[in-house]
From Swiss-Prot:
Residues of this chain annotated as glycosylated in UniProt: N51, N76, N91, N110, N140
Signal peptide per UniProt: 1-33
Lineage: Eukaryota, Metazoa, Chordata, Craniata, Vertebrata
Subcellular location: Membrane
Protein name: Uroplakin-3b-like protein 2
Keyword Transmembrane helix listed: yes
Residue numbers on the Extracellular membrane side: 34-204
Annotated GO CC locations: membrane
């Protein structure tokens, strides 16, 4: 620092001018060439996949990362700054441009055009050594709309993907980590028929099993029909009988006997 103050008198500048010169030099070291925006601070951290023993570490549409614990303790980063996870195709990392405003943040719906999007919004309080987050599962939200900024939508294909963390505030990017290595998701494999002709023994076994299955189905059908037939015959269709006795009457015909001596 003392050498910087000696630079002013050496080139004929006063103490105030020397201080201004040093401030300008420090500012220029943080400004990207061709822009008026300060370059984000580089954090020497590489995102890593979670432990191999974790179930679901890699699926058809998700992968799980370790927490970046204690990686955002720089004095340039505030607790109010937003920490995004940038998800990109491996061949799109070179063309990635950090958004300057929240309106420029790409959503998962823009992934097919840009090759990257931002998700898993957080802050450094959640990434302390004893943070609240345990794992970061990328692509785990099946209910959010892909047009929504920050949506953790399932990944559309096997990849390969690369990720990094990006810190932003209202003025633009503040800091960023390094890109991760390539991550490839699992792929669904179609069922394949057994190659080569089947042996005669296999054909005989398949035929016997088919015959036994047909016989079993026939027996079951016959038992079902017999049971249903007997059940229908034994079912009474009359109503409940009334209790009581019925007296039987015999009908007699009354004949009048002619009176004796009648003429």
């Amino acid at each position: 620092m003392d050498n910087s103050w000696r630079l002013g008198p050496a080139i004929g500048l006063s103490a105030g001018q020397s201080q201004l010169l040093v401030s300008l030099l420090l500012l220029l070291t943080r400004v990207q060439p061709g822009t008026d925006v300060a370059a984000p601070e580089h954090i020497s951290y590489v995102p890593q996949l979670s432990n191999d023993t974790l179930a679901g570490r890699l699926t058809l549409s998700t992968f799980t990362l370790e927490q970046p614990l204690g990686q955002f303790s720089s004095h340039n980063i505030s607790d109010l700054d937003t920490i995004w996870l940038v998800v990109a195709l491996s061949n799109a990392t070179q063309s990635f441009t950090a958004p300057r405003t929240n309106q420029d943040i790409p959503a998962p719906a823009n992934f097919s055009q840009r090759g990257y999007y931002l998700t898993l919004r957080a802050n450094r309080v959640l990434y302390q050594t004893r943070g609240q987050l345990h794992v970061l599962r990328v692509g785990n939200d099946t209910h959010c709309q892909p047009t929504k900024i920050g949506c953790n939508h399932p990944l559309p294909g096997p990849g390969p993907y690369r990720v990094k963390f990006l810190v932003m505030n209202d003025e633009g990017p503040v800091a960023e980590t390094k890109w991760s290595s390539d991550t490839r998701l699992q792929q669904a494999q179609a069922l394949r028929a057994v190659p080569g002709p089947q042996s005669p023994g296999t054909v005989v076994i398949i035929a016997i099993l088919s015959i036994l299955l047909a016989v079993l189905l026939t027996v079951l059908l016959a038992v079902l029909i017999y049971t249903c037939f007997n059940s229908c015959r034994s079912t009474s269709l009359s109503g409940p009988e009334e209790a009581g006795s019925v007296r039987r009457y015999t009908t007699h015909l009354a004949f009048s006997t002619p009176a004796e001596g009648a003429s």
